[in-house]
């Protein structure tokens, strides 16, 4: 059991931060109260909880923190760099293109009656269960609910390729709007619906529903030949996984990479293993994430101790270490990791 902290402990901590303790609200148990201090750096008083002050990453003075932030941004641009702006534009373009492709499935729907027919035809799932979302929407279309506060809901969501047309809209109460996305998430297991529910701050207990949601979504994808059942998908490590890249996610990750790591992944690189004299060339645009590089380096090695150790290393540790190898020892990185070094022409 750790020793109970006293006022003296907080006075000593304050002294190291150039602060002076003025008062403590809970003298019996200081760690459970508030503390008021004088910052001798900015000559201002501030009050915070003792726990917050104790765990502060720097001095804990909000005035000094605000001043430091202001000085940091003085003369600095807060806008995106041209590279980041370009990548964000690529992400947006890809999302719009994906939605347009998905929207082709609904090109034959021209009005509300066509939509009702579509919902009715898809009223039952491949496993024989009723499509709870379609059933809910059909009931609201046939027997509209009125109220003072109504919200517009896209019956076929925009994220699923639905158009922003009058025939694709329905007026729902706020409660029904949340329920609609909840039911659709249960049936189709799409992230867009889940995020909408979270945004409304009324997230259902997904933990209790996840098994049913996955089962229903799995049946739907199996019948439609999409997702993990799309031709060209592969199985690995006992789990069904997709070979189709999440382009949006990859592009977002690339904006956070250092220029060296970005070049090594997207523009290609050559690696050499010292002990086994193994070399591997990573062609441009074949891998886009550091975990993929780790996998390539493991596969390239013949059976040896370092291959076993690399395969058993924690993935975050391996990716971080290889990023430092790419950076180079002269730049504050490292020269190699488990024998692998990058060949810089």
Curated annotation (Swiss-Prot):
<dbReference type="InterPro" id="IPR003615">
    <property type="entry name" value="HNH_nuc"/>
</dbReference>
<protein>
    <recommendedName>
        <fullName>Uncharacterized 38.5 kDa protein in psbA intron 1</fullName>
    </recommendedName>
</protein>
<dbReference type="GO" id="GO:0003676">
    <property type="term" value="F:nucleic acid binding"/>
</dbReference>
<keyword id="KW-0150">Chloroplast</keyword>
<dbReference type="GO" id="GO:0004519">
    <property type="term" value="F:endonuclease activity"/>
</dbReference>
<dbReference type="GO" id="GO:0008270">
    <property type="term" value="F:zinc ion binding"/>
</dbReference>
<keyword id="KW-0934">Plastid</keyword>
<dbReference type="Pfam" id="PF01844">
    <property type="entry name" value="HNH"/>
</dbReference>
<dbReference type="InterPro" id="IPR002711">
    <property type="entry name" value="HNH"/>
</dbReference>
<dbReference type="GO" id="GO:0009507">
    <property type="term" value="C:chloroplast"/>
</dbReference>
């Amino acid at each position: 059991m750790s020793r109970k902290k006293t006022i003296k402990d907080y006075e000593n901590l304050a002294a190291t931060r150039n602060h002076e303790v003025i008062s403590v609200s809970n003298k019996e148990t200081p760690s459970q109260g508030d503390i008021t201090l004088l910052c001798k750096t900015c000559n201002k008083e501030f009050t915070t909880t003792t726990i917050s002050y104790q765990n502060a990453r720097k001095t804990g003075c909000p005035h000094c923190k605000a001043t430091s932030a202001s000085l940091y941004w003085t003369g600095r641009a807060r806008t995106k760099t041209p590279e980041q702006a370009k990548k964000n534009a690529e992400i947006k373009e890809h999302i719009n293109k994906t939605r347009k492709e998905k929207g082709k499935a609904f090109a034959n729907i021209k009005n509300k009656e066509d939509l009702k027919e579509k919902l009715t035809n898809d009223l039952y799932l491949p496993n024989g269960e009723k499509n709870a979302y379609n059933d809910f929407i059909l009931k609201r279309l046939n027997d509209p609910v009125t109220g003072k506060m109504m919200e517009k809901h896209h019956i076929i969501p925009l994220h699923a390729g639905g158009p922003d047309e009058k025939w694709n809209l329905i007026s729902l109460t706020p409660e029904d709007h949340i329920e609609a996305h909840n039911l659709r998430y249960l049936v189709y297991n799409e992230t867009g619906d889940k995020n909408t529910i979270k945004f409304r701050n009324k997230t259902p207990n997904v933990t209790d529903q996840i098994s049913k949601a996955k089962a229903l979504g799995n049946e739907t994808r199996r019948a439609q030949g999409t997702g993990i059942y799309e031709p060209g998908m592969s199985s690995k490590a006992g789990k069904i996984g997709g070979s189709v890249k999440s382009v949006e996610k990859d592009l977002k990750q690339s904006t956070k990479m250092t220029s060296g790591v970005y070049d090594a992944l997207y523009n290609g690189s050559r690696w050499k293993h010292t002990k086994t004299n193994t070399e591997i060339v990573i062609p441009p645009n074949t891998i886009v994430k550091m975990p993929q590089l780790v996998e390539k380096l493991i596969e390239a090695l013949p059976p040896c101790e370092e291959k076993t150790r690399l395969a058993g290393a924690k993935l975050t540790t391996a990716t971080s270490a290889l990023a430092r190898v790419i950076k180079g020892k002269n730049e504050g990185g490292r020269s190699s990791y488990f024998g692998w070094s990058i060949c810089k022409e």
